[in-house]
Amino acid sequence: MIEIDGRSLRVEDVYAVAVEYDRVSISDDTLKAVEEKHEAFLKLINSGKTVYGVNTGFGSLLNVHIERDQEIELQKNLIRSHSSGVGDYLENRYVRAIMAVRLNSLAAGYSAVSADLLNMMVEMLNRDVIPAVPKYGSVGASGDLAPLAHIGLAMMGEGKAFFEGRLMDSARALEKAGLKPYQFKEKEGVALINGTSFMSGILSIAVMDAHDILENAIRSALLSFEALGGTSKAFTPWILGARPHLGQVAIGNRFREYLTGSDIVKRADSVKVQDAYTLRCIPQVYGSVADVIDYVENVLSVEINSATDNPLFNGEEVVSGGNFHGEPVALAADFLAIALTDLGNMVERRIARLVDTNLSGLPPFLTPDSGLNSGYMIPQYTAAALCNRNKVLAYPSSADTIPTSANQEDHVSMGATGSLKLLEIIDNVRYIIAIEYLLGSQALEFTDKGMSPSTRKIYEKIREKVEKLDHDRPPSFDIETIRKMMDKKEFISALP
């Protein structure tokens, strides 16, 4: 059970709600504090105070006055008009993450929503009523308006939603779950949709996936390192400590420990001076990726516990601000995209080295009868194609901005785009690593098997499901098998 209180949500909690379907709850104290703020806000509105998005129009329509008896209708119209997303529906796990982040942001108490709204979101998550949210439509300021509006639309019993994984009209989904359509109160529509929870929810899942990617990349690199006869001299502690970036030192020490007991490395240490960069600089490159992952997680730890609505209410005054601007998240998503793209680049270069007999000293394309057999010639092409795709996707979305709302919103973050394309990069890098697992294990068939105990664990785990290559067969199926093993964390479990 994940407790929502508006201040202590962790990235791993978001993952637990989204992927592992952990239930959520809100304490009575949190609900009481939220409701008190809501009641205080209503008193302010009833006094005639002008508040953006409550008794005014939105965006460039901010100078249009809304009568008191139209304020509820305004919120409903906002949800309907802003539900303008297009494209395929986002996977339910990402929508669950988005809802968890938005729920926590609203629970902070600055958005002046009622406890009823929070309870509705809790019940939808716990009863598996997940709004159908199109992927595209957010520019990342003023918040993730379009996709979050689709969540509000489903809450009202309009649009589409998934119930227990099946797509249907949201009214039917709510009914099957034993819920009634939600009636938005003053400010609740704008509070729900005006925030960074779309990009933050997606990035929360992405950064957890990035941890797994790095762990797998370390393990797949062990196979290539030993197959190529690498020397561990570059991982000497004082060398790593002479440039003490946290990630570099940590990765270098782990890699050296994993190689302990290898006869292959022991021989290489006695005769080789240094290796090519893709072997020698694993701590520097992988360590930098680890540092980026930590940076992104730190950004998210702040963002998912922040009030990103506009305007905000502290119990006494309402102030319009800019916390909805997704720049911190947008930059973090782009940074992670660049880091993972370069991780894939290094892995692909080792793959290329494995199949090149002039560089590896191994049989051409890792087949015992090359010529008649092409062996693993083409998987390197696949890795190269995926790297090329990632290099296109790695262009920073945050480098662009397109003014919206008649230039009232004249600078935007494009953080949603950055988070979405990061998902494709992650998928591509997983496949690149799967190819290194496949080819690295095959390359070890041509050594004396004097690998370290740690490397042997990975090698044997692969051989449980993928046979060595004696003659040509389609590599695609083996790549997919290894990819599924990665998804199940089998290699991480085999070598903690």
Curated annotation (Swiss-Prot):
Subcellular location: Cytoplasm
Record-level Gene Ontology MF annotations: histidine ammonia-lyase activity
Annotated GO biological process: L-histidine catabolic process to glutamate and formamide; L-histidine catabolic process to glutamate and formate
Top-level taxon in the UniProt lineage: Archaea
UniProt catalytic activity: L-histidine = trans-urocanate + NH4(+)
UniProt organism field: Thermoplasma acidophilum (strain ATCC 25905 / DSM 1728 / JCM 9062 / NBRC 15155 / AMRC-C165)
Protein name: Probable histidine ammonia-lyase
Cross-link (5-imidazolinone (Ala-Gly)) at residue(s): 141-143
Listed InterPro entries: Aromatic_Lyase (IPR001106), Fumarase/histidase_N (IPR024083), HutH (IPR005921), L-Aspartase-like (IPR008948), Phe/His_NH3-lyase_AS (IPR022313)
